[in-house]
Amino acid sequence: MANKAVNDFILAMNYDKKKLLTHQGESIENRFIKEGNQLPDEFVVIERKKRSLSTNTSDISVTATNDSRLYPGALLVVDETLLENNPTLLAVDRAPMTYSIDLPGLASSDSFLQVEDPSNSSVRGAVNDLLAKWHQDYGQVNNVPARMQYEKITAHSMEQLKVKFGSDFEKTGNSLDIDFNSVHSGEKQIQIVNFKQIYYTVSVDAVKNPGDVFQDTVTVEDLKQRGISAERPLVYISSVAYGRQVYLKLETTSKSDEVEAAFEALIKGVKVAPQTEWKQILDNTEVKAVILGGDPSSGARVVTGKVDMVEDLIQEGSRFTADHPGLPISYTTSFLRDNVVATFQNSTDYVETKVTAYRNGDLLLDHSGAYVAQYYITWNELSYDHQGKEVLTPKAWDRNGQDLTAHFTTSIPLKGNVRNLSVKIRECTGLAWEWWRTVYEKTDLPLVRKRTISIWGTTLYPQVEDKVEND
């Protein structure tokens, strides 16, 4: 066994993996109230609620384009820096490691390689040599489509996005320029989507004994001086996925509750019909993307535009070629002591803002009947008090109960906060035993963009029509 002393030192460590790999983000109290704002064309209700998000993952996203610490076989210290995806690399003399790559067509003798002293440069060089051989000998007959993965979330806070996409997402988030203030005020709805296009994965053989990864020159004292202990044990990067990833920001000022469904259709490439609510939402959506990988420059690209560029962005990196090289986009780690895959548990509280808009409407009355008519129209107007509780204020049309003759027309504007709309219309028959006859009576009418109630006919045969226009 290589380096028995170091081997015994690592095997003797006793620690709680779950405790070491758990990160608790923001903690907030649920002290939020509803509020309503009457705008010129609509009544907007803003509701904020405490939400919690937890993730358990062994697949860690890479958002830095040139991180020399993240290569297969790298030894990382388990501490706060690892939880923040800004790991501390243990740089000591290393023993050889065996690597494999999962590109199709490779003969068994070509699918693995050994690196004598693993480091970022030596591993990268060896992998690049193998990739060059694959492109030359196998790439022409083996068309490699990217393995597509995606995940999405409606953005409410940076802590929420870091739990979802990785602790170092803030770097990418800054490039996306996420306007959280507009989200919290209800002015915008924003969704973040992460597309991963995996070209190939480089893995290292499982470590049989912890001491096998070190040269004999490395001592227990060397590890102790670098802070390695049961409180700060070691993991090694067991695999790295290479490819291309795209972070999309979809931003709209629409207040519709169909926004998430419209974005889902966009992501899945569903054809959206014209003259639909989804089409209106997407036409009112701005797109910003941060692209990592798939470009010989090896840098991050930021592009902006409309939704019609989303499909092009995805198709652009859909296949692995020499012109579309892969960058590290995610990695997994295993504990050096026992090869158990490291699973990170992250959680946070955040404030979800839900906005519901109620358009103003009009109630049109048209009376052309050969009789005297009376109208009784009432409704409630919704508001919220300082505790966020609903307050319903009774309202009535100022011409209720008046005798109105033909031809009478009027339009009653109704604000978006109108609830419990009731309309009763009666006509004078002239009959002693039934002086007034009800022509129309409905309660709890929904507020629509335009409702026209027309009455006509004679005293004994009154007619009525209730026509709704709500496009």
UniProtKB/Swiss-Prot annotation:
The keyword Transcription does not apply. A motif (Cholesterol binding) lies at residues 459-460. It comes from the Bacteria. A motif (Conserved undecapeptide) lies at residues 427-437. Disruption phenotype: No change in biofilm formation, about 35% decreased adherence to human lung pneumocytes. Complete loss of host cell hemolytic activity. The chain crosses the membrane at residues 158-171, 178-187, 256-265, 273-285. Changing T63A: 70% reduction in host cell hemolytic activity, no change in apparent molecular weight. InterPro entries: Thiol_cytolys_C, Thiol_cytolys_C_sf, Thiol_cytolysin, Thiol_cytolysin_ab_sf, Thiol_cytolysin_sf. The keyword ATP-binding does not apply. Keywords: Cell wall, Cytolysis, Hemolysis, Host cell membrane, Host membrane, Lipid-binding, Membrane, Secreted, Toxin, Transmembrane, Transmembrane beta strand, Virulence. Homooligomeric pore complex of 35 to 50 subunits; when inserted in the host membrane. This is Pneumolysin. The lineage of its organism: Bacteria, Bacillati, Bacillota, Bacilli, Lactobacillales. The gene is ply.
